[in-house]
Amino acid sequence: MRNVRLFRALLGVDKRTVIEDIEFEEDDAGDGARVIARVRPRSAVLRRCGRCGRKASWYDRGAGLRQWRSLDWGTVEVFLEAEAPRVNCPTHGPTVVAVPWARHHAGHTYAFDDTVAWLAVACSKTAVCELMRIAWRTVGAIVARVWADTEKRIDRFANLRRIGIDEISYKRHHRYLTVVVDHDSGRLVWAAPGHDKATLGLFFDALGAERAAQITHVSADAADWIADVVTERCPDAIQCADPFHVVAWATEALDVERRRAWNDARAIARTEPKWGRGRPGKNAAPRPGRERARRLKGARYALWKNPEDLTERQSAKLAWIAKTDPRLYRAYLLKESLRHVFSVKGEEGKQALDRWISWAQRCRIPVFVELAARIKRHRVAIDAALDHGLSQGLIESTNTKIRLLTRIAFGFRSPQALIALAMLTLAGHRPTLPGRHNHPQISQ
């Protein structure tokens, strides 16, 4: 066939593919056209298992002729057409034969898959589907195939020393992913559906005992299910509790105390006389309980925010709380003091934490007394975070990016496609466009 090199380049195939014929088909209406290239593998790559690439004996003709979608030529769709017999693999049994232009179980060529994967990482959902003329679910399947191929060529657990572990909700009804990041490279290392001991155990199974022993630091949110697995699988690693989550415990305790004060004010308001319709008269009885409940309800953000971030109005609310409710203001000071502990860090931070625990135990606020006991239970991990300066900041930023990908990936059939998209985007192995690299080859 003439111009073989030209057609190989246009079709995105290599010398292992024989191009027998190329036809141009146009429908009667004239509003659609297709190019069909009839191809076959060279004898050197014939009769190989599509799953493992090993040579195998002939089994049957399979489903006969098959077509694989290739990249468009301008506005014309292009397909590769070839026989798809089956071989009898010693490992996998009857399996469709491997072809050098496409992945196993794929309806698209390497070039098409790689282009779609690059677009899925770099473009919007609408742009990918409109440009490539495929459904979004098809994009999910392609992304999963490309990541599976990429994963075989890389060692994502190489030089893993300091890791962060967290969970993220990816779907309603409490559907979670467990994610692991590398603190040194800043990359996503591993993700899987679920957030329990069994799920995290899968990570350490994939990592292996030898590499697990090389992990020196693990940061987490002090969840028991993470701490238990880490203690069992890499007992020599230093576990660090995330400072943000510890301060969040104090913020939650402060909000419990605010709601208590608000409910007390509402109870007083229920005993106060009710006003009739319209503007109250000059001689109407005051209702301080109702006014106090209203102001406490609106004070949540003034209590939550850092002092340097308060607006003028929120600062006024905080000053009002300090004057009218010493107990609630004391709870606020406890929260801010705990935040200060993690801003100083090191030995000074540990001494400040000792003083904070002593104060919280004597503060006569039950929720903060309980918080002091909780912090004492996790004291070793908190001290490690103060000593080594390790936090979940990196993994929280990764989670934010995964949440964005979750919205993009809406419509994928399974979480595996979402995980594949996240790995291609955040694991440091982003796909490249065909022609910019050597695409994966079947072993010979």
UniProtKB/Swiss-Prot annotation:
GO BP, one annotated term: transposition
Recorded GO CC terms: peptidoglycan-based cell wall; plasma membrane
Source domain of life: Bacteria
Region feature (Disordered): 273-292
Keywords: DNA recombination, DNA-binding, Transposable element, Transposition
InterPro entries hit by this protein: Transpos_ISL3 (IPR047951), Transposase_DDE (IPR002560), Transposase_HTH (IPR032877), Transposase_Znf (IPR029261)
GO terms, molecular function: DNA binding
Family note: Belongs to the transposase 12 family.
Protein name: Transposase for insertion sequence element IS1557
